[in-house]
């Protein structure tokens, strides 16, 4: 499968080893993996785990370089997950706008799930850090600590969404319905395509 764990991990390794525009490359790797999976928390965690494992495996030997590269790679993942939240927001707005057959709990569960993406992101990176090699472990832990203390762009996007949708019952399971997942996956694929075309156009400019 094109989106298998091994292929995602290898793509992340290649992005790190390229040493160029690591944040953009990692964002593209993460987005490509996300768009090829069902839009749900389990799929997102699987992608984050595989990408982070690739980051750790490819960590260069130099301490200073490790910090810089890992920071860029983490930022790329964060940017991709921010797009996931944005895709979820658009899917939610589409569902609310149509309203036909729309159950209140479907909206609440989708919101609860989107709210937890940052938590899943940080916890997954932290879990990978625990078993990472000696070069990558301290840098991953530092990234987790910083993200926990100051937050991520993914979390900021989620918070913005929560402020706009004032529903109660946010402590639901946070599982995405099939209908929501299908719409969000389509939106995310469109975002990924647009970003890819924009990046390709910029690379052509002398």
Positions of the model-derived regions?
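Extended, low-complexity, charged alpha-helical tracts
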Residues: 4-205
């Amino acid at each position: 499968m094109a989106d298998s764990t091994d292929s995602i991990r290898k793509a992340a390794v290649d992005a790190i080893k390229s040493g160029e525009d690591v944040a953009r490359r990692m964002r593209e790797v993460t987005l490509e993996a996300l768009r090829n999976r069902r839009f749900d928390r389990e799929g997102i965690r699987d992608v984050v785990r595989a990408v982070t494992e690739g980051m750790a495996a490819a960590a260069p030997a130099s301490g200073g370089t490790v910090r810089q590269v890992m920071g860029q790679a983490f930022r790329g993942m964060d940017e991709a997950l921010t797009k996931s939240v944005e895709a979820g927001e658009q899917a939610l707005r589409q569902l609310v706008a149509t309203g036909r057959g729309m159950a209140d709990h479907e909206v609440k569960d989708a919101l609860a799930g989107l709210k937890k993406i940052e938590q899943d992101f940080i916890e997954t990176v932290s879990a990978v850090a625990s078993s990472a090699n000696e070069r990558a472990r301290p840098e991953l832990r530092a990234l987790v600590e910083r993200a926990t203390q100051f937050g991520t762009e993914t979390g900021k996007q989620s918070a913005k969404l929560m402020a706009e949708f004032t529903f109660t019952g946010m402590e639901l399971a946070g599982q995405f319905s099939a209908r929501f997942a299908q719409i969000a996956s389509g939106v995310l694929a469109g975002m990924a395509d647009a970003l890819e075309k924009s990046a390709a156009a910029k690379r052509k400019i002398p």
